[in-house]
Amino acid sequence: MGSILSRRIAGVEDIDIQANSAYRYPPKSGNYFASHFFMGGEKFDTPHPEGYLFGENMDLNFLGSRPVQFPYVTPAPHEPVKTLRSLVNIRKDSLRLVRYKDDADSPTEDGDKPRVLYSLEFTFDADARVAITIYCQASEEFLNGRAVYSPKSPSLQSETVHYKRGVSQQFSLPSFKIDFSEWKDDELNFDLDRGVFPVVIQAVVDEGDVVEVTGHAHVLLAAFEKHMDGSFSVKPLKQKQIVDRVSYLLQEIYGIENKNNQETKPSDDENSDNSNECVVCLSDLRDTLILPCRHLCLCTSCADTLRYQANNCPICRLPFRALLQIRAVRKKPGALSPVSFSPVLAQSLEHDEHSCPFKKSKPHPASLASKKPKRETNSDSVPPGYEPISLLEALNGLRAVSPAIPSAPLYEEITYSGISDGLSQASCPLAAIDHILDSSRQKGRPQSKAPDSTLRSPSSPIHEEDEEKLSEDVDAPPPLGGAELALRESSSPESFITEEVDESSSPQQGTRAASIENVLQDSSPEHCGRGPPADIYLPALGPDSCSVGIDE
């Protein structure tokens, strides 16, 4: 295989290769892969030669069974990798079957069983003019670098529909209907032995004699499923991109969704994992892909730590064989077009020795099973006038810095409306309780110290013995609480101000204190009548605080 890639000839040798050849997995004899692989211009050895680096080994059967000539010159070491341009893309999530009920309910001419007719619809994007054709029960063959599909019968091939360039274009062809009443159950799925695909959607770039895009195509392979109620649905299998007569198998990257898509509704669960941060440190943006599970979940720093300390993916816990960093580049903002500063972007630029731009740059994977090359600074690979950014930022834009959430005020900082302005913040809660007690004693009401109407502090609860003693001394004048002792025995100026306010309060302040007492009385069990009363708790006032009863 290495000799085939090293040759530079105009064509490819016409080798007679059977269907079950060495280019089918598993092969009859020998190995499918060699003992090393090249990525980013570097060579990596692996002790698992039969391990597909970008997915499952069975995915290799979706590729062609014949070797092809690699059309590009092997890049020199430390030379940026050339990226491929995708001119056509079929959104596989939009692929669906549309049933025609009028024709499905009508019996056939023979009167055997009713016809079950469906048609295919999907959405696609095109940066060039394309020609789309649908094939059913078709086999694949590559001729001169182009994929040619041959259906089982001519009636299983649709007419070719031409489209102009555009985004989010809808494909619908009611004239081509699929009659599942004529299909067998084994024809609904992909047959590996025969190499027959249930349905193939081929979109070929149709730009005339433009050499740059000649032979460029996008292929969607799908299968059908039959449900218990007799209905059918379509299931995408794989997508392939054919560029310069080479077929590339497209693989999904998990965690790279475009959040700007209006069709995708945001999740109501705030705890869902829909952020762009690394799943390990929860601070830096994700820019490292784990292979072969293809989870984009790590930042640069955590990836360097993981490759030396563990060999399992933090998401699926499967062992990984390589780490691939993917980043993008953008034009630097000019003097007249300032761009808001992003601290996350600044952190990414500070770790430039680990960066690996996606375009015009060289990715540096790390393999635990192979050598661990030292990463070099690749700032020279960034084109002039561009700067590297995260791939997630390129898709979803720069992340806006959320404003700082103000912290909740401390207990001492809460202001009370019934206290004079001369009191300090630390003495406000004590003065408020003292004011309520003094105003209640001035009215001369009987005081009840029942346990149900007692205001307790979590740091100093009242024991049962104290509760019984308080219930016996109902008619006796109440002793001074801890709050009153703390205020009246103090010699500070604030304590004198507190006593003056309590003893000679103005009518307005007395009314305000009475309103507070009325609120407390309305919430008592006698006024509410809601069954067993509930205890009221306040945060601890301090290490020397004690519980204070509320007058009824």
UniProtKB/Swiss-Prot annotation:
Q: Which GO terms describe its molecular function?
A: ubiquitin protein ligase activity; ubiquitin-protein transferase activity; zinc ion binding
Gene3D superfamilies for this protein: Zinc/RING finger domain, C3HC4 (zinc finger)
Cellular localization per UniProt: Early endosome
Q: Which CDD domains match?
A: mRING-HC-C3HC5_MGRN1
What top-level branch of life does the organism fall under? Eukaryota
Modification sites for Phosphoserine? 471, 524
Is-annotated flag, keyword Transmembrane helix? no
Pathway, per record: Protein modification; protein ubiquitination
Region of interest called Disordered, as start-end residue ranges on this chain? 355-384, 439-552
Does this entry carry the keyword Lipoprotein? Answer: yes
RING-type zinc finger span: 278-317
Recorded E.C. number(s)?
A: 2.3.2.27
- Give the positions of lipid attachment, kind N-myristoyl glycine: 2
* Location of the motif Required for TSG101-binding: 406-409
- Which Pfam families did the record assign? zf-C3HC4_3
Q: Which residues carry this modification: Phosphotyrosine?
A: 411
Q: Write down the SMART domains for this protein, in alphabetical order.
A: RING (SM00184)
Q: Tell me, which GO biological process terms does this entry list?
A: endosome to lysosome transport; heart development; negative regulation of adenylate cyclase-activating G protein-coupled receptor signaling pathway; negative regulation of G protein-coupled receptor signaling pathway; negative regulation of smoothened signaling pathway; protein monoubiquitination; protein polyubiquitination; protein ubiquitination
Question: Where does the record place Acidic residues bias?
Answer: 464-475
Briefly state the modifications made to the protein after translation: Autoubiquitinated in vitro.
Role noted for this protein: E3 ubiquitin-protein ligase. Mediates monoubiquitination at multiple sites of TSG101 in the presence of UBE2D1, but not of UBE2G1, nor UBE2H. Plays a role in the regulation of endosome-to-lysosome trafficking. Impairs MC1R- and MC4R-signaling by competing with GNAS-binding to MCRs and inhibiting agonist-induced cAMP production. Does not inhibit ADRB2-signaling. Does not promote MC1R ubiquitination. Acts also as a negative regulator of hedgehog signaling.
Subunit details: Interacts with MC1R and MC4R, but not with TBXA2R. Interacts with TSG101. Interacts with mislocalized cytosolically exposed PRNP; this interaction alters MGRN1 subcellular location and causes lysosomal enlargement.
**Name recorded for this polypeptide:** E3 ubiquitin-protein ligase MGRN1
This chain's source organism reads Homo sapiens
